């Protein structure tokens, strides 16, 4: 109801602080799809603050990584998740799918791109590896 009231005002920008906190995976998916659909229809920008790193590559176009109030890096999900050591240095983990690909690459010597951070991207990498 609160979100609907805000959207009626047709804001150009919406700032959300940890909107997925406390939600189960289905609730997270439903909320994020709703936000994505409504904002695309109304051409609204969402600035999202989150610690849920698995949501970020799915829904973000641009990422700003911050640590202790300072910007550490800025870029697309592909650019950001291609820097796993930088993320770890600032106490962030990789998305689960990136972590899995990183393990396959480092420990099992699979020729996969460990910076991939979405399920569809991982599927392409695994199919490419299987075809080799």
Regions found by a protein language model. Give the residues of each.
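A short, surface-exposed alpha-helical micro-motif characterized by mixed small hydrophobic
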Residues: 56-58
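Helical segment within the ABC ATPase nucleotide-binding domain
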Residues: 29-41
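ABC ATPase C-loop
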Residues: 1-3, 7
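A short, proline-enriched helix->beta-strand linker immediately N-terminal to the Walker B motif
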Residues: 8-12
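H-loop/switch region of ABC-family ATPase nucleotide-binding domains
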Residues: 50-51
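Catalytic Walker B motif of ABC-type/P-loop ATPase nucleotide-binding domains
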Residues: 14-17
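ABC ATPase "signature
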Residues: 74-75
């Amino acid at each position: 109801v609160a979100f609907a009231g805000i959207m009626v005002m047709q804001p150009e920008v919406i700032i959300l602080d940890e909107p997925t906190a406390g939600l189960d995976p289905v609730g997270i998916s439903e909320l994020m799809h709703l936000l994505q659909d409504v904002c695309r229809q109304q051409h609204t920008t969402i600035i999202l603050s989150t610690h849920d790193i698995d949501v970020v590559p799915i829904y973000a176009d641009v990422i700003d990584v911050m640590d202790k109030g300072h910007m550490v890096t800025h870029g697309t999900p592909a650019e950001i998740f291609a820097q796993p050591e930088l993320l770890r240095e600032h106490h962030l983990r990789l998305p689960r799918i990136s972590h899995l690909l990183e393990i396959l690459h480092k420990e099992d010597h699979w020729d996969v791109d460990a910076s991939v951070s979405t399920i569809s991207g991982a599927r392409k990498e695994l199919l490419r590896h299987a075809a080799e």
